[in-house]
A protein has these predicted regions:
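Mobile active-site "lid"/loop adjacent to the S-adenosyl-L-methionine
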Residues: 153-165, 218-238
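Long, positively charged, glycine-interspersed low-complexity recognition regions
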Residues: 219, 228-311
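Conserved proline-anchored active-site loop of SAM-dependent methyltransferases
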Residues: 20, 32-46, 53-58, 138-145, ...
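A structural motif corresponding to the C-terminal end of an alpha-helix
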Residues: 173-187, 241-254
Length: 311
């Protein structure tokens, strides 16, 4: 059974893991590098025992690492104490009626003032101490809109209040995910992908057993991570060149990407595919529930998985 990430993040592969994971090479004895790990869904659910989670989003990566090193029961208790401290709703104990709400309208009205106080306290401590309180951060994710992890350009967490709370389903999702994460020999790195790959190539520990999975920002999408110029053509070219170097060194890789999005195409990726002997698999995915894709009758996204090994 797939362990779903207990918070939402742009570009999650949770919805296609049933297609993606069977395309991975045999994982016994391999080290998986999840080069753009995001919320960790791929690394957590892959069969590899040793997983390197790498991502430049330090809040996201730091939360994963904190969950890995903290006993599940202690983390759960700390979150529940935080909820009680700020007076946030506990529908799993008291039900919706206790808060004058129902499951349709949700709990946003009841939680808004307490949520904003928690958000202000988190941002203030982050600014003053230069560190993150991951219990407060995860509590914000629970009560935030769509459980989204979002920061503004000034580094402040700015997700608005949502309509749900730490219900039984959310608690189960958290515990299941943490148990699966803890079953791995997990390592964490917050490096630019170029630096990460250089370090991996120089490591004797990983020699001969490395598999690199890449789910980079997609050059032609309008996802949040590209709205501020977070991924450009040079990044795309550098990543594809790095994958060629992995192939030349006999290292297996897998790349998730998008060749077409609405009326746009990715000529850099298409030319690379055309001029290389790599295998290309079409991935079927619906974006109907995504918060960052336009919903029009002409919308089309062509997602692919590209590998340098025989499937």
């Amino acid at each position: 059974m797939i362990a779903k990430c207990p918070f939402n993040y742009t570009g999650s592969k949770h919805g296609i893991l049933d297609q993606l994971l069977p395309l991975f090479p045999p994982m016994e004895g391999r080290v998986l590098c999840d080069l753009f790990a995001g919320g960790g869904s791929v690394g957590v659910n892959a069969e590899a025992e040793v997983v390197l989670f790498n991502d430049l989003n330090r809040a996201q990566l730091g939360l994963l690492e904190y969950m890995y090193h903290t006993p599940s029961s202690l983390f759960l208790e700390a979150v529940q104490r935080c909820i009680a401290e700020y007076g946030l709703s506990e529908s799993s104990r008291y039900g919706y009626a206790h808060y004058g709400a129902d499951s349709t309208r949700g709990l946003a009205e009841s939680n808004k003032s307490a949520y904003l106080r928690l958000r202000d306290d988190f941002n203030l401590s982050k600014q003053e101490a230069g560190t993150m309180d991951y219990v407060k951060l995860y509590t914000l994710l629970i009560f935030g809109f769509n459980n989204q992890l979002r920061f503004n350009t000034g580094g402040a967490f700015n997700t608005p209040v949502g309509k749900r709370d730490f219900n039984r389903a959310m608690q189960h999702k958290l515990v299941t995910f943490m148990q699966r994460l803890k079953s791995k020999d997990a390592r964490f790195a917050a490096q630019d992908f170029r630096a990460c790959l250089r370090d991996l190539s120089a490591s004797e520990e990983y020699a001969g057993r490395l598999f690199v999975y890449c789910d980079p920002p997609y050059l032609i999408t309008t996802a949040t991570y590209n709205e501020r110029g977070g991924w450009g053509e040079q990044d795309e070219l550098d990543l594809l060149a790095a994958l060629d170097e992995l192939d030349a060194a006999g290292v297996y890789f897998g790349l998730s990407n998008v060749t077409h999005e609405s009326d746009k195409a990715n000529p850099i990726l298409l030319e690379w595919i055309k001029s290389r002997p790599y295998k290309v698999c079409r991935i079927k995915k619906s974006y109907r529930n995504s918060n960052y894709h336009k919903q029009t009758s002409t919308h089309r996204t062509r997602e692919v998985y590209i590998t340098n090994y025989h499937l």
